[in-house]
């Protein structure tokens, strides 16, 4: 393909990788100059009305690790990654004036803050959007987005029967060495972004770094070295350690690995090692992730409304004292407390824990579920807007749970932590 003598920006969003990266691949094929760009909005660094930042330190640290890796990987392709904090429009205009940018390639996002970001791109730059975060591409599902079923099982069965997963694409060929730009802003540090340095807690279930290389290292470890994928369905409700689940959500949240790549690795594993309920269940969870993305694509800003996608009215409270007790792990439920303290100390919590603390927050204390969702957004390293708000709506009874269940938390603790090992790990104070 003959390249146009033009300059394109690849605006990285939650797709921070070089392998199976549509925007990057398209830009490098069509333009003789390509610049990478990542923008950190100032809103991420500011406090919410509930006294925590929109992005707290654990997620910020993982993001910076991810950007460091991406910068190195792009440099191998002779592409510069320009990381900017603050005014996106001004940065793009500066790049346009200095390098004659004509085109911009990016992953399409449809939630409100991301729409507002996209509106800052100057009108005289041609934009190329792609749907690069799905397992099942929107063009390949057997229904219109407006007709996405409100029950997950219906969606899953239709997609499994009538759709397909596109094969992942490789890493693009390197650009000429003259494509590199040597005068670029330095990557910010945690301190420059306004955070204190954090240290890893020895009890963490996620002793991992951010970035594409770390994502593939985890695939190698969890799939091929230990073959823990073969037992995923049996262990996935665990609470302690790195082995009980894949933890791939960490890297998927930043797009350091694509769902298509994970799917392809599972299929390879099924051909060469074993195919069982556990290997299927990892794919099942990828479909859940897709489903919440489609639900938000269908319903738009309803996912941020107090009545959720159902428009249900409950008497929600905004009691700051109770919210703080929940955040501090100081509720009447030890199982909730242990999970909240793990989150505060590590930026992570198991899926089982998330469901229980969300159910307690919304169904026992009847607090505005959106405050809980905002706290998860701040704290969870693997925060994904669609899964986070989809799951919170589900647990609060305003989303996709047709039975509107609530968790019996003491029973959950007895079942999943029968010897109190998890609760002792996070609640027992050290004696000196």
Task: Label the predicted regions.
Residues 1-167, 341-342, 387-391:
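Trp/Phe/Arg-rich N-terminal binding region typifying the photolyase-homology
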Residues 40-43, 110, 133, 158, ...:
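Short loop/turn segments at secondary-structure transitions that flank enzyme active sites
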Residues 2-4, 25, 199-206, 213-216, ...:
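C-terminal catalytic domain of photolyase/cryptochrome flavoproteins
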Residues 15, 56, 87, 111, ...:
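Secondary-structure junction/capping motif
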Residues 55-60, 84, 210-213, 303-306:
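Short acidic/polar alpha-helix capping motifs at helix-coil junctions
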Residues 111, 115-250:
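Specificity-determining recognition surfaces
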């Amino acid at each position: 393909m003959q390249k146009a003598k033009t300059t394109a920006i690849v605006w990285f969003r939650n797709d921070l990788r070089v392998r199976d990266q549509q925007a990057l691949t398209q830009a490098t094929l069509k333009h003789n100059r390509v610049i990478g760009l990542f923008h950190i909005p100032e809103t991420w660094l500011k406090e919410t009305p509930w006294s925590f930042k929109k992005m707290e330190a654990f997620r910020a640290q993982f993001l910076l690790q991810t950007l460091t890796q991406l910068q190195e990987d792009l440099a191998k392709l002779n592409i510069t990654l320009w990381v900017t904090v603050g005014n996106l429009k001004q940065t793009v205009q500066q790049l346009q004036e200095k390098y004659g940018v004509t085109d911009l390639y990016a992953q399409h996002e449809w939630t409100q803050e991301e729409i507002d970001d996209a509106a800052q791109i100057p009108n005289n730059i041609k934009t190329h959007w792609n749907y690069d975060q799905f397992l099942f591409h929107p063009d390949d599902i057997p229904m219109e987005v407006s007709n996405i079923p409100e029950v997950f099982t219906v969606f899953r069965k239709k997609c499994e029967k009538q759709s397909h997963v596109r094969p992942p694409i490789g890493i693009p060929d390197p650009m000429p060495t003259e494509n590199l730009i040597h005068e670029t802003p330095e990557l910010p540090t945690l301190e420059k972004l306004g955070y204190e340095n954090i240290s890893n807690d020895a009890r963490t279930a996620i002793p991992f770094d951010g970035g594409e290389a770390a994502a593939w290292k985890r695939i190698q470890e969890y799939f091929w070295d230990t073959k823990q994928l073969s037992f995923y369905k049996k262990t996935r409700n665990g609470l302690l350690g790195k082995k009980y689940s894949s933890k791939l959500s960490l890297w998927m949240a930043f797009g350091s690995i694509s769902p298509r790549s994970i799917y392809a690795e599972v299929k390879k594993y099924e051909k060469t090692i074993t195919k069982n309920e556990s290997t299927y269940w990892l794919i099942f969870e990828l479909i859940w992730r897709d489903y919440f993305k489609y639900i938000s694509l269908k319903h738009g800003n309803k996912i941020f409304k107090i009545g959720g996608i159902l428009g249900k009215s409950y008497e929600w409270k905004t009691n700051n004292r109770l919210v703080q007790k929940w955040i501090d792990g100081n509720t009447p439920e030890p199982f909730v407390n242990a999970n909240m303290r793990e989150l505060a100390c590590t930026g992570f919590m198991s899926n089982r824990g998330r469901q229980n603390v969300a159910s307690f927050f919304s169904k026992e204390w009847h607090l505005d579920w959106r405050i809980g969702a905002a706290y998860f957004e701040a704290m969870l390293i693997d925060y994904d807007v669609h899964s986070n708000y989809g799951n919170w709506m589900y647990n609060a009874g305003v989303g996709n749970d047709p039975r509107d269940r609530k968790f019996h938390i003491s029973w959950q603790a007895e079942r999943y932590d029968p010897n109190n090992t998890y609760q002792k790990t996070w609640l027992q104070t050290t004696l000196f």
